Amino acid sequence: MSDVDMESGSDDSGMEDLDEEIQKIKQKMIDDSQSVVLANQLLILLRKNGDFDELDIKRRQFVEWAPLNPLNWKNWIEDFQNRKPEPSVAEVEEMFEKALFDENDVTIWVERAMYAYKVANDKNKKEDFKFCRDVCSKALENLGTRYDSGGHIWLIFLEYEMSYLKNSMNAPDYQRLADQVFALFERALHCPTDQLEDVYVLAEQFCTEFKQHHKLEELKKTYNSTMRQKEQLSKFEELIQQEETKKQGLKQFFDHEKKSGIPSRIKMAHERLVSELDDDEEAWIAYGAWADIELKLPQVAVKVYSRALRHCPYSFVLHQQALLAFERDRRPNEEIDALWERARSNVINSAEEGRSLYRTYAFLLRRRIHLTGSSDYSPMAEVFDEGAALLREWFSMAWDTTADYRQMQAYFYASLMKNMDKCRNIWNDILASGFGRFAGKWIEAVRLERQFGDKENARKYLNKALNSVSDNINEIYMYYVQFEREEGTLAELDLVLEKVNSQVAHRAIRPQKKVSEKPAPAPKSKQDHIQKRTSGGEPIVKKVKGDDGGFKAPLPPSNAKSSSAVSSSNASSTPAPGSFAVQKAAPGTEDARTIFVSNLDFTTTEDEIRQAIEGVASIRFARKANSDLVHRGFAYVVMENDQKAQQALLKDRVPVKGRPMFISANDPEKRVGFKFSTTLEKSKVFVRNVHFQATDDELKALFSKFGTVTSVRRVTHKDGKPKGIAFVDFDTEASAQKCVASGDKLMLRERELEVALSNPPVKKDKSHGKPAAIGASLEEDGPRKGHAAKLQLVPRAITNKTPQITARLDAMDVSEGTSTSQPLSNDQFRKMFMKN
């Protein structure tokens, strides 16, 4: 916010210019009457022009709705002090309190401290030096540890204390006063402020002037320690001082202070943010949330939110949080209600904001009524009804797009108001406004009826649901049948089963959608596809699902370039159908010494990979979009030479940040298989029930009594967490046989281990599994969702009878009837079709 130059001109032309500027600002304020910037500029110009009568009126008007800037507050306080008759100290202090509520600014605190010192030395005033000391202590509490402002407060306070001590040298308690000043210097030198050096110079002066040389060394140690902290903070200050990097510097400074965990420093960091960015809604929200959740001081949170609403009166989030903060601090109901009136009238700009505010205040009233012991919830009902009517008027059909507000309102009327008629009216409105096709909404209405209403109305809702629901109709079927089991008679249960079975059959015979008989478009060649993708510039890198369902990594930049070069040079040749030639990396090239690493933590750094693998030349991470801090969990690592690349491959599954890092050669055409044997290995034992925190060394030491252990491998998940199993390799088969046949209890970390020869089962290949029989259903849930029946793959001539839902008296469960005929096999189907 830029202030108008305060220096007044002496000639008439200057006065005329000011009059013209004042008129321009007044004209602008006609169109933008709530502009804080224009209001502050107008006050400065009016004072500079000498229009004190109008200035006084405008000040009182603007301060009601807008925060004045520090310059306008200092001008107002100065004019207030100079008025006749002279105002009392209490009146001036009240002005300072109002100013500091708007702007917690160091210049205002300095003015207040200077005024307090002046009053303390005025013999006509009753205030003594204790008054000045109290004011300075308040200033330290509000700004003492703030990097850019605390030093000013410390210097002025220490100078006042030294002056008072100098005048008390003959006092009997002189030594006590000197010790107090020394303690103040210690506190000041513990605060890393931008004027720390000046504070230390003043400390040296104090020790020399008041003969405290023996304490200087102690102060110097404190100073040196704090200087190291200041050097860290000064790096952020360089960014803050430059306009283009100001926000970035403030964010980094705040994050640094937050890591310290010291509440006073975190508070000062928040103060710095809201001081520099006073109209930033997010900064105020974070400050209030910290005071509420971390600091847990309701009185501090209330003050923060009250200040925030002065600077951001348009924020519905701040009003919402302020209502709850006022409630936690047990503020008078009148204050809370006044805040609610301002919020309701000024900050609702969308249906979501309106629902959130009305919901917050409605349940605030519920808690208030509960605390008083009353059972009259009519004030809460008025708020719910007002919110529904007002939001419906403002936002039409979009006022409650998810029906959450009306569901809360209906539950309130049923549970607290005991008014089921009103509750049913609200639910009828919900179901009639587009939610009648969802099974969940009907079931919620039925549950409310069962809890607070009667069974007959619940049954009416379920009957209507049978003909209305198109989303997940089976859920309604099952719920209705279960409802009659629990609430109805046998006749009512039979009636429902008949209705449900009738609907199931009706849905099953509905005509199916005709499949389009248009011929499928001819597949495009991969070469055409590649040319189309690359014609607009750089080739597009897509995520492709591999054969195993995992993520197939894109080619590194070097391979992408070589692939395009090969395709252009071999354009005349015709590749085989379905093939795509990839040039093999020549020995000695960069591609030949590039390896592919994956399964990395998204925050793994280059240094951590270099520590795990020796001989790394460069690393290229696959970054996530719009993020330089995290990557996709894999990278291409270029080694110094081919030998280093081969050595790196031997370190496959080396742990990095607690996860096994997968290392493979950079060959997109080669699929990396399982590198361990899946057959019987007589020299290796399989160990089960291994403690998750057991180490390889512990396992090796335990099994060494049976023979020489060559290796130990604990099996882990991809995220590095152990599975609780391991494989132990012996140098001979006899050692492994001895281990299995010993019969000894093998205990490790209070767990008994189970051992057997390593013979893992063959992993089933899902892609080559035996096809299911023709006509075998993949689902057993009846008709699919929606009005259309499920697509049937069984010839009509041999279709079984329509499944019927029956009530078995022995199990009392809903099940599908089974056909007595035997299902046909694939061979029978094949013979039947071959006859034609």
UniProtKB/Swiss-Prot annotation:
HAT repeat residues: 127-163, 296-329, 331-367, 418-451, 453-486
InterPro entries linked: HAT (IPR003107), LSM_interact (IPR008669), Nucleotide-bd_a/b_plait_sf (IPR012677), RBD_domain_sf (IPR035979), RRM_dom (IPR000504), Suf (IPR008847), TPR-like_helical_dom_sf (IPR011990)
Biased composition (Polar residues): 816-827
Tissues and organs where the protein is expressed, per its UniProt entry: Ubiquitously expressed.
Region (Disordered) location: 507-585, 757-786, 811-830
GO molecular function, one term: U4 snRNA binding
Residue ranges, compositional bias (Basic and acidic residues): 540-550
Limits of the RRM domain: 593-668, 683-760
Top-level taxon of the source organism: Eukaryota
Cellular localisation: Nucleus, Nucleoplasm
BP terms from Gene Ontology: mRNA processing; RNA splicing
Deletion consequences: Lethal at the young adult stage due to a ruptured vulva. RNAi-mediated knockdown causes a partial reduction in the number of hatched embryos. RNAi-mediated knockdown in a usip-1 (tm1897) mutant background causes complete embryonic lethality.
Gene Ontology cellular component annotations, sorted alphabetically: nucleoplasm
Any matching Pfam family: RRM_1
Bias kind Low complexity: ranges: 558-579
Alphabetical keyword list: mRNA processing, mRNA splicing, Nucleus, Repeat, RNA-binding
Subunit description: Forms a complex composed of sart-3, terminal uridylyltransferase usip-1 and U6 snRNA; complex formation is mediated by usip-1 and sart-3 binding to U6 snRNA. Associates with U4 and U6 snRNP complexes, probably by interacting with U4 and U6 snRNAs.
Entry function: U6 snRNP-binding protein that functions as a recycling factor of the splicing machinery. Promotes the initial reassembly of U4 and U6 snRNPs following their ejection from the spliceosome during its maturation.
Protein name: Spliceosome associated factor 3, U4/U6 recycling protein
Organism this protein belongs to: Caenorhabditis elegans
